[in-house]
Amino acid sequence: PTGKMTLGQISEAGFILLLPWCFRRIGIKFTLLAGMLAWSLRYVLFGFGDAGEGVWMLLLGIALHGVCYDFFFVAGQVYTDARAGERFKASAQGLLTLATYGLGMLIGFAVAGEITDRYAQAGSHAWQSVWLFPAGLAFAVFVLFLVLFRDPAERTQGVRQ
């Protein structure tokens, strides 16, 4: 059973190799959007999957880890590096790391705990609701990013916009 979890790492290795191709073909905005949409889909799959007939949804959700992580976090790091310029690269990466792995995770874990507590029922949890909450949130971020993200640069040091 635990071997199935390696699907996430395997897919991450594959999608990291696709990242440069995606930057050239669809640009940074749509690469990031693909990652955001994959997060939403992943949470939906976890919400509706189960250990019986819906196990394929859980396995697909695990396999989506690669596109989720690489097309969102890694692509964001590459974009930040390209936009920051030589003088501010280290500071920009430090700020991004603080925002995502520091404050972002701290706030995310607190919110996840509240959501899990909110959907507690008779010694268990309404897991579908627990998973659909972040799915909806990720989709809302996807829509906001689609509408609001604008980068005036045509190209950012080899990263197509």
Task: Name every feature range the model reports, one short phrase each.
Residues G47-G61:
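Helix-loop junctions at membrane interfaces in 12-TM secondary transporters
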Residues P1-A13, W56-M57, Q128-L132:
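Loop-to-transmembrane helix entry
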Residues G14-I28, T116-D117:
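Helix-to-loop junctions at the C-terminal end of transmembrane segments
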Residues L132-Q161:
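Multi-pass alpha-helical transporter architecture, strongest
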Residues L37-A51:
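C-terminal ends and interior cores of transmembrane alpha-helices
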Residues G113-A138:
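A membrane-interface helix-boundary motif in multi-pass transporters
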